[in-house]
Amino acid sequence: MSAKLKKLSDLSKRGPHRVLEGDLGYTGLPGKVYTPAEGKNLPGVAFGHDWLKDVAAYEDTLRHLASWGIAVAAPDTETGFKPDHAGLAADLETAMQILGGVRLGNGNISVSPGKLGIVGHGMGGGAAVLAAVDNPKAKAVAAVYPANVAPSAVEAARNLFVPGMVVGPGEDGDSLFDPGNPAKLAYNWAGEVVYRAPKKGDQQSFSEDNMVKRILGLGKSDRGLQETVRGLLVGYLLHQLDEDKAYASYSEPDAEGSGVESLTGEKLTKAAGLARDNASFSLF
């Protein structure tokens, strides 16, 4: 029997902590920092944005993570038409180091160097994978509808032994226009990985810049999808980084919840486009 993603609806709502916003730029790296108003030895993540996005397109998501006790540093770099993917990966690593090495707020907020992870959406999801390979500081990675990047995150995943969560299209998804293959990324992942597929989710619906999307004809934001993915992120990160056993099911490969399926085995292989043709061999 598959495990249940317990309290997903609760985790999809704002958490109990008041949230503070800070300027990452004071460290020399443009961007934003979001933290709970207080707390010691907190888990923390660096967050990478998608192509042509900036931190403002994810403000509600970043505040949501902080409201559940997870500090977030989000670089506002590589936002142009021709971004340097390796450069964004390097900035994510720097942001993670800043979280673990700088006392935040008025000195009453600290992030444990042993509770750091990397999260990203689209291009940022691919960059998160690149940043985590051979990086002992990264304890977990979450890639939300990861896009293709250069160097290839799909290939880099073969050498990624950090636990990971990949959020991507499910069997009901139309990934024709998605600029990546999240399922193949998960298939190649060398370490423990879970693949979550929110119902009718796609890469274009997660960021919050709805007006920009309408102008450019790139679809629209999906508030329900955003809330579901936020809940998945909170549960997974609290278990992996903070070792909160109440959310252990979020690290189970076959766990499912309302509106969320998990792809494993043959289903994941098929979604990755690697399913074998089992037709009988014939000379004619």
Explain the meaning of each model-derived region.
Residues 139-203:
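The feature captures the conserved acid-bearing segment of alpha/beta-hydrolase catalytic domains
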Residues 70, 77-79, 146, 200:
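Active-site loop/turn elements of alpha/beta-hydrolase fold enzymes
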Residues 200, 209-284:
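Alpha/beta-hydrolase-fold serine-hydrolase catalytic core, especially in secreted/extracellular enzymes
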Residues 57, 83-114, 126, 130-133, ...:
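Alpha/beta-hydrolase active-site loop
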Residues 120-125, 144:
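Conserved alpha/beta-hydrolase "nucleophile elbow" surrounding the catalytic nucleophile
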Residues 41-50:
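Short beta-strand element of the alpha/beta-hydrolase
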Residues 56-76:
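Short amphipathic alpha-helix adjacent to the substrate-entry channel of hydrolases
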Residues 1-40:
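N-terminal cap/lid segment of alpha/beta-hydrolase-fold proteins
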